[in-house]
């Protein structure tokens, strides 16, 4: 499971011209800029577990 997640992340990072990669990069830029009012934009909500599975299902 960990290897599959690492593979997916590397595949997205190495091909930034794809539509879902641009969407993922823009979401991380928005969430890291300090705007944490939208819980859907970031994969980590304060006090909870990471929501990798739901975010990855939106990509495909």
Swiss-Prot record:
Name listed for the protein in its UniProt record: Putative transcriptional regulator XtpA
General remark: This is a leaderless mRNA.
Keywords: Antibiotic resistance, Transcription, Transcription regulation
Disruption phenotype: Increased susceptibility to sub-lethal concentrations of aminoglycoside antibiotics neomycin, kanamycin, streptomycin, spectinomycin and kasugamycin, but not non-aminoglycosides tetracycline, chloramphenicol or erythromycin. 10-fold increased transcription of gvcB.
Function of the protein: Controls the expression of small non-coding RNA GcvB, which represses the expression of many amino acid transporter proteins and uptake of aminoglycoside antibiotics in cells. Might be a transcriptional activator. An RNA (xtr) with a tRNA-like fold possibly derived from tRNA-Arg(UCG) is encoded entirely within the protein; xtr does not have the sequence corresponding to tRNA anticodon or variable arms. 10 synonymous codon changes in the xtr region of xtpA have the same phenotype as a deletion mutation, suggesting the mRNA secondary structure is important for function.
GO biological process: response to antibiotic
């Amino acid at each position: 499971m960990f290897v599959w997640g690492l593979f997916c992340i590397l595949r997205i990072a190495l091909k930034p011209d794809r539509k879902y990669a641009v969407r993922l990069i823009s979401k991380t830029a928005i969430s890291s800029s300090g705007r944490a009012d939208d819980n859907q934009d970031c994969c980590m909500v304060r006090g909870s577990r990471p929501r990798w599975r739901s975010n990855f299902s939106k990509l495909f």
